[in-house]
């Protein structure tokens, strides 16, 4: 895939110590199979570079991401899509260096799941965050695992069960967002330059392992359980398929509660 046609821009800066990943299909920046594959390839190629100290993920255009491809959630594609997305999430959780994420505009569904797999989230105050999957008759599997340890069980359940969106200010209050800034990319770069750039890259990797050696295995184990629940039970239900079809057909869903 040529750089011009790739859904992801990838480059190194700060003398190879910072890997930049930029979602590059504005304005929606849909997290589809091509986007997931490009992100996994970039991480696989660069994360083990000895001088690397961090990753910064952001997006072109006014919005980070409207979410995953609904077409790819249909029964004939769902298993492949979900396993690929969860593979990306696992690789981000296993990153040996911090992943910083700069967020503007809408960050919804699968877009928020990808962002929440990072370590430090920088966001504009008016950015919007949500997991609207429940309104389509499904649920957000990765977010069900990533949000509770980040924002607490009660706040996570609010977002996961209601499907409502919150702004950056509320996200900061509940712990979803680490830093609020009018220019999240600049804030993330400043944080890197002030706190990470001059550290020993090898010692930083040990610190990352130490901080996450108990939490990451728990999240990954839960993700296995939730993925099976989604694929084997949810997608066998009438209402899950009906909700997705209704969204694609731009009509109201006919819930049968089964």
Curated annotation (Swiss-Prot):
Entry's Pfam families? Answer: ECH_1 (PF00378)
Q: Name the gene for this chain.
A: dch
Give one GO biological process term.
fatty acid beta-oxidation
Q: Which InterPro entries match?
A: ClpP/crotonase-like_dom_sf (IPR029045), Dienoyl_CoA_hydratase (IPR017602), Enoyl-CoA_hydra/iso (IPR001753), Enoyl-CoA_hydra_C (IPR014748)
Keywords, alphabetical: Aromatic hydrocarbons catabolism, Lyase
Family to which the UniProt record says this protein belongs: Belongs to the enoyl-CoA hydratase/isomerase family.
Protein EC: 4.2.1.100
Where does this protein come from, organism-wise? Thauera aromatica
Reactions catalysed, semicolon-separated, are: cyclohexa-1,5-diene-1-carbonyl-CoA + H2O = 6-hydroxycyclohex-1-ene-1-carbonyl-CoA
Q: What's the name of the protein?
A: Cyclohexa-1,5-dienecarbonyl-CoA hydratase
